[in-house]
Amino acid sequence: MDYKTILNQSSDLLKNFSIKSARLDSELLLSSSLKISRENLLLNLNKEIKPNQQKKFKSLLEKRTKKVPVAYILGYKDFWKSKFLISRSVLIPRPDTELIVEEALNYLPKDKYKKILDIGTGSGSILIS
């Protein structure tokens, strides 16, 4: 089975579980299973998936059908310009939180050292970004 076929099938499956980001989630989980970037995955949709890779992908996909967030499945989340390790003990950084980082950087002087107190940082994504 090629990458395109398995992506289409998995995306349809996730849609049946009312997962709105079905295609994106499928791409992220498959690229992780293949140990390649999402970009590389999308550039090689005609490539065949190996049985061990397909088994790994099915395992990740099953977790997603149980509504486990992709960041918890993969153990990381891209936020701002970095990749953050994520576990169930921290909140997942949200895309709209990146606006807070942007606004803070616009507000703070660019040429001065910044001191910020962040209590209960969780993943630390806001503070580090």
Language model feature labels by segment:
Residues 27, 59, 73, 114-116:
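A residue-level detector for conformationally permissive "hinge/kink" positions
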Residues 7, 26-27, 57, 67-70, ...:
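A general structural signal for well-ordered alpha-helical segments in protein cores
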Residues 1-53, 57:
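A short N-terminal interaction module
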Residues 32-107:
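Conserved AdoMet
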Residues 98-129:
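Conserved SAM/SAH cofactor-binding pocket of Class I
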